[in-house]
């Protein structure tokens, strides 16, 4: 084969590989918040948002390896949930330009102060629950999500009245947190 053709084929393969490796979004997960909400509304599903630090957070890596990256989780979750990855890697080249721009805004919007944080939204985009790493594998994690979501409406009945009791409101922490510091 001609040397020029070999070099051209090698360059094409490298560009294709670079384009494919440009994202840290796992198979079966979206990285676009608006697209996830639209899909959830259209399919009447909850959105599971994984706020992760994929290249530096040990607990995030464990959650991914033990739960989210498994076929059992992806198959079980696909029936009930829209999966959204909001990654905050130190190596920003792992993100698409859109994710690099939007992910810090989502971390702030959802007041994420530590990683991993898993936020579940209903099909209307309202927060239902939040959690993080849970040991036990994909079956146990899916069961925990199902149970928390099932009981969330009952729990909210009691939490909302308490929130404004005695003229007070829960204060969200302010200042620079570890999560926000990691994004800068």
Give the residues covered by each predicted segment.
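Thiol-based oxidoreductase modules, predominantly thioredoxin-like and allied folds used
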Residues: 27-30, 52-53, 66-101, 115
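Loop/turn elements at helix/coil->beta-strand transitions in domains of secreted/extracellular proteins
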Residues: 43-47, 79-85, 113-116, 123-126
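Thiol-/selenol-based redox modules, centered on thioredoxin-like
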Residues: 134-184
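Bacterial Sec-dependent signal peptides at the C-terminal "C-region" and cleavage site
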Residues: 17-27
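Local sequence-structure signature of Cys/Sec-based thiol-disulfide redox active-site neighborhoods
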Residues: 31-73
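Bacterial N-terminal signal peptides that target proteins for export
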Residues: 1-9
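Non-catalytic, surface beta->alpha helical segment in thiol-disulfide oxidoreductase systems
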Residues: 66-68, 105-154
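Bacterial N-terminal signal peptides
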Residues: 8-18
């Amino acid at each position: 084969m001609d040397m020029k053709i070999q070099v051209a084929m090698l360059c094409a393969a490298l560009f294709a590989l670079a384009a494919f490796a440009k994202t840290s979004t796992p198979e079966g997960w979206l990285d676009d918040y608006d697209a996830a909400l639209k899909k959830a509304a259209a399919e009447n599903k909850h959105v599971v948002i994984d706020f992760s630090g994929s290249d530096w957070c040990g607990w995030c890596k464990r959650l991914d390896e033990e739960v989210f990256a498994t076929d059992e989780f992806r198959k079980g979750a696909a029936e009930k949930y829209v999966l959204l990855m909001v990654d905050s890697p130190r190596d920003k080249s792992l993100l698409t330009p859109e994710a690099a721009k939007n992910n810090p805004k989502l971390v702030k919007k959802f007041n994420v102060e530590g990683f991993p944080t898993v936020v579940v939204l209903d099909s209307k985009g309202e927060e239902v629950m939040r959690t993080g790493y849970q040991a036990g594998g994909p079956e146990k994690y899916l069961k925990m999500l199902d149970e928390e979501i099932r009981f969330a409406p009952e729990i909210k009945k009691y939490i909302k009245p308490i929130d404004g009791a005695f003229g007070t409101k829960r204060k969200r922490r302010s200042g620079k947190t570890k999560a926000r510091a990691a994004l800068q």
